[in-house]
């Protein structure tokens, strides 16, 4: 049987305060509750927190990418759209931090390969196009649409 800080198996003891019984598992990071959970719930909690870390990284890095995209845009309307999305990121990051807190977890990031790839592609659009050109703006719009589709998914 495996024993670690995120999953404790029945009939095992840990020194972290996550005591177990035959009935089930204590939720990791939630040492103040007397509620017991099933192995599936614990596994889901770990999975869910892992996905939150991924999303948290994506939101934080998207803000940096949007700042670059805004500076690279020629059209004032496009620049304004990037700035608006940039400002919305603060709210989304705060909401994620609230969710981490409700789960008894510290907000942590885990590199999101999908967002990293999309932001790298946006950087390529900037470096591969002429400054102050319609083509660059079109490339930035395309990159932003891809990011938006990822966020929806």
Model regions: which residues?
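Amphipathic alpha-helical hairpins
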Residues: 2-153
């Amino acid at each position: 049987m495996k024993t670690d800080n995120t999953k404790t198996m029945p009939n095992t003891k840990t020194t972290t305060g996550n005591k177990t019984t035959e009935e089930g598992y204590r939720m990791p990071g939630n040492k103040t509750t007397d509620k017991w959970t099933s192995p599936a719930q614990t596994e889901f909690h770990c999975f869910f927190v892992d996905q939150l870390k991924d999303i948290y990284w994506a939101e934080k890095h998207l803000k940096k990418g949007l700042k670059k995209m805004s500076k690279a845009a020629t059209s004032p309307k496009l620049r304004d759209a990037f700035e608006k999305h940039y400002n919305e990121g603060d709210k989304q990051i705060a909401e994620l931090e609230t969710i981490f807190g409700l789960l008894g977890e510290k907000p942590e990031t885990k590199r999101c390969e999908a967002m990293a790839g999309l932001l790298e592609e946006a950087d390529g659009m900037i470096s591969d196009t002429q400054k102050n050109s319609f083509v660059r703006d079109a490339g930035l719009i395309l990159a932003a649409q891809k990011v938006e589709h990822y966020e929806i998914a």
